[in-house]
């Protein structure tokens, strides 16, 4: 055997394998392109430490970071969506529901919990945007109404974090009816003289922005959140005009009176707790930072 054959002999070849990185360990900030460690980003409430861009949060992660640690009770979790119209577009509605339920672990796009905020009893709900773009169907409407009714029964404030693409087209008129249903429920909350704080996050559009998201006693936006009814492209095609840059961002809406304030995610607990305390004439438990 020649020296070359010996060199190429399989026994003399050392196999090297590239180290594989598990999927989901790293992510990239969509604003500054900074590569971020996923666990550290989650601990920082999905806020980029470099540019302070607010990334999307899951509903449960948001409520977990917002409510006090301790006992929390999930409300209306027994409601499950049904395909009453046997709707089909590129996929059957049942298939879309099954895929969203599997990927998110949620039954539908709204999570409601009862707990405390800085020692104050509160009902809080959050949209899960990853579930069919957070679209509002009959289950979302029913859960929101239950949240309102519980707040009235418990004589406490209600907070809602919106992240939604609009009414769920697969449920047709039943989805559109939720706009009136949720608005009527909020009228009962107002008559009970209980506060409703609406937090609009990126992105909040369609039937939710035209109903429950904009009906807060105080409407709060997260920084650079996109908020509107129709999308920019649809509006420009309709009015045949070029629209100003950032006209659907929270900063533009604050400047033009559509929002009351913009609050950083890390300040949300203290700011909302203080607002509810003032509106209900109660005191809060101050946190030591």
Swiss-Prot record:
Zn(2+) binds at residues 29, 32, 48, 51. Component of the acetyl coenzyme A carboxylase (ACC) complex. Biotin carboxylase (BC) catalyzes the carboxylation of biotin on its carrier protein (BCCP) and then the CO(2) group is transferred by the transcarboxylase to acetyl-CoA to form malonyl-CoA. Its EC number is 2.1.3.15. Acetyl-CoA carboxylase is a heterohexamer composed of biotin carboxyl carrier protein (AccB), biotin carboxylase (AccC) and two subunits each of ACCase subunit alpha (AccA) and ACCase subunit beta (AccD). The keyword Transferase applies. It comes from the Bacteria. GO terms for molecular function: acetyl-CoA carboxylase activity; ATP binding; carboxyl- or carbamoyltransferase activity; zinc ion binding. GO terms for cellular component: acetate CoA-transferase complex. Pfam families: Carboxyl_trans, Zn_ribbon_ACC. Pathway: Lipid metabolism; malonyl-CoA biosynthesis; malonyl-CoA from acetyl-CoA: step 1/1. Residues 25-289 form the CoA carboxyltransferase N-terminal domain. The gene is accD2. This is Acetyl-coenzyme A carboxylase carboxyl transferase subunit beta 2. The keyword DNA-binding does not apply. A zinc finger (C4-type) spans 29-51. It is found in: Cytoplasm. Binds 1 zinc ion per subunit. Belongs to the AccD/PCCB family. Keywords: ATP-binding, Cytoplasm, Fatty acid biosynthesis, Fatty acid metabolism, Lipid biosynthesis, Lipid metabolism, Metal-binding, Nucleotide-binding, Transferase, Zinc, Zinc-finger. One of its GO terms (biological process) is fatty acid biosynthetic process. NCBIfam families: accD.
């Amino acid at each position: 055997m020649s020296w070359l054959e010996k060199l190429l002999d399989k026994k003399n070849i050392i196999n090297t394998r590239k180290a594989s990185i598990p999927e989901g360990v790293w992510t990239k900030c969509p604003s500054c392109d900074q590569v971020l460690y996923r666990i550290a980003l989650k601990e920082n409430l999905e806020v980029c430490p470099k540019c302070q861009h607010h990334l999307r949060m899951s509903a449960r992660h948001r409520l977990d970071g917002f409510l006090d640690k301790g006992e929390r009770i999930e409300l209306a979790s027994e409601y499950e969506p049904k395909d009453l119209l046997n709707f089909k577009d590129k996929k059957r509605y049942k298939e879309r529901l099954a895929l969203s339920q599997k990927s998110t672990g949620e039954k539908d796009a709204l999570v409601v919990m009862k707990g405390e905020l800085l020692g104050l009893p509160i009902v809080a709900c959050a949209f899960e945007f990853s579930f069919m773009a957070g679209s509002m169907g009959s289950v979302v409407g029913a859960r929101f109404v239950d949240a309102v009714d519980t707040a009235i029964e418990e004589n406490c404030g209600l907070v809602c974090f919106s992240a939604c693409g609009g009414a769920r087209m697969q449920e047709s008129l039943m989805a559109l009816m939720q706009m009136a249903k949720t608005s009527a429920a909020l009228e009962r909350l107002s008559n009970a003289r209980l506060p409703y704080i609406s937090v609009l996050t990126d992105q909040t559009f369609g039937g939710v922005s035209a109903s429950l998201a904009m009906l807060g006693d105080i409407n709060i936006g997260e920084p650079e959140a996109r908020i509107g009814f129709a999308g920019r492209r649809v509006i420009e095609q309709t009015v045949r005009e070029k629209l100003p840059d950032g006209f659907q961002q929270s900063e533009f809406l604050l400047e033009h009176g559509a929002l009351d304030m913009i609050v950083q995610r890390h300040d949300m607990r203290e700011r909302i707790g203080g607002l509810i305390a003032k509106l209900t004439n109660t005191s809060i438990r101050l946190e030591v930072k």
